[in-house]
Amino acid sequence: MKQLSHPLGTVYVPGPNDDLSEAYDLYRNSDVTWAADTETTGLNQYKSYFRVRIVQVGTTDKAWILRPEWHMQAINDLTGGDGRPVWWHNWVYDGLGMEESLGLNFDNTFTGAQDTETAFRLIDPRPIMKGGSGHKLEQLGNEYIAYAGKKDARGMILEECKRIHGRECSADNMWVMIPVDNEAYQLYAGQDVFLTARLAEVGMVKLKELQLTRFYEFERPLGWRLAQMQRDGILFDDEWASRVEQEYLDTAEQYERELAEQWGITKGKTAKSYANSAAALIDKFEQFDVVWNKFSDKTNRPSLDKSVIKELTNFGSNEDIKGLANAVFEAKRNHHYAGYIRQMRDELGSDGRIHPNIRPMQAATHRMSISNPPIQQFPRDDARVRGSLIADDGEVIITADYAQVEFRVGAAVSQDKVMTSKIINGEDLHETTATALFGPGFNKGQRQASKPIGFGRLYLGGANGIYKQMAESDTTGYLPTINQVKKAIKAFDTSYRGYYRWATGLKDKTEKTGGILYTATGRRLIVSPSYAAPNYAIQSVARDLFAAGINKAHKMGLGKYIRLVVHDEIVASAPADKAQEIGAQLSEAMSTTFKGVPIEVEWDIKGKRWTK
């Protein structure tokens, strides 16, 4: 059996008939930390070209490189399907990949699966750019194992690949092109095992020291349940999507022509469209006497970001400025929405379904994220993008979403009596800010326009920041002035004094603790800057309540219907004749009471498509 020497241990590369008894003996020894990993042909397990090339298993200093064509029985025996704890780094990726490529049942793999990424996201949620240790295997290895070889191994693989294949090989395709029997590749694979096993031992000690073990035990089954959603995926209507994409492109082209023909905008050498021709647009706006109040950090030229353009579409009575800004805004918006359709098609599995990557603790607040494609960014103001995702045959889409969850959690953690009373009595939480802006006779559109002030102030947002957000997103036509926003903020703070005291007190306390914050559920977060403490505290608790609801829904047998989780919303596909029953059950699973405040759910049957 070939042996390769690595600074952290020995990498064993067995042939088809070599003896693996030592690996089996160590696996059976429950005192030994056992780790595993895979090397694959790509990141999307549901593409037709996806393959698991090797599975590597072992301990802190011994690793075996197993090839599916030779060692399938050993792969099956040594990866935790019997319940023996096996440590992975982002085990969901490897588990789903082995199921799709090798036929290993994902749910069986879960019985023994433990995850170092989950452990270290609990220990320090911050990425490197925010002062944390990061969460990639090589980042954690450099921080906790004091070994910085991972980067060198990647470099060696690329060099080897280029030596063999020349310019044809790149950082993007080297994982497919590098020969499986290349020693640099095998050392890299073995190193993953060494690092994962060593990080597992460090991580479990730290979880215990920080009293976070119960959160790890909570997150483990949650990760499995989210992975089941990823595996099941959601059906994609390509015919609808193609038509919608063309509609967006046609509309964008209409506004592009307007920019060229009506407004005389010329396309710059590097601009992909008239709407991105910054120099020409700035000159044209200045011809209409626009005075700029925001500039690009990189170029120091006037900024044409979304907030600036949106504000100009509501620019007083100057119809030229508003017309030009509207053409720019609509051209960009429609190009952007067409891009979402392309992203869905790029990620489409060979089974005709989208299998998005649902990460349970991606944000610094431990909120979930959904990407590839970025479904949580899909627009709410235009149902056509979401409408590309549909229920299975004979089924309908059901959505279940928390009602004003941030306010409800804010009332619970602050114990503000006025806010709590309004929630319990079903009163309008946005009445205070809407009245301050528009008077007691405000209409529905004006109430909608005032909502960003309440949500912004919940997180101690200032007038300028809240106003910018409103300028970017307002579709009501009732955009207030900055002075009106300041007046509404004062009314909010006066009405909800208890909340304001809690929020400012938490900010001050977090500053004194160096950013360490323990939420109302006991979760440990690291906040920076300290004024973000109320945001972290509320978002994290809301996430824990949502996660508990997901777990409960699965225990009630509803997991087979759930297709997506987006923000605080569950998207399900269920038989039409059972939709009422299943919707009510989802609502029951998600609803709860937290510190005396009801956390309520609104659910709806959408029909065939995930639309309004």
Question: Where are the regions that the model predicts?
Answer:
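Conserved "right-hand" nucleotidyltransferase catalytic core of DNA-directed polymerases
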Residues: M1-E22, R28, A35-T40, N44, ...
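Active-site-proximal helix-loop-helix substrate-binding element of RNase H-like nuclease domains
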Residues: K2-G15, N44-L207, E431-L437
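Short, glycine/acidic-enriched loop or turn micro-motifs at the edges of active sites
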Residues: T40-G42, V92, T118, Q404, ...
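Metal-dependent catalytic core segments for phosphate chemistry
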Residues: Q45-Q56, W64, T399, E406-G441
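Short, conserved charged micro-motifs
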Residues: Q73, D577-A584
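Conserved catalytic core of nucleic-acid polymerases
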Residues: R231, V290-W292, K310, S317, ...
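Short beta-strand-to-loop capping motifs
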Residues: A572-A576
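A common structural junction motif
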Residues: S587-V597
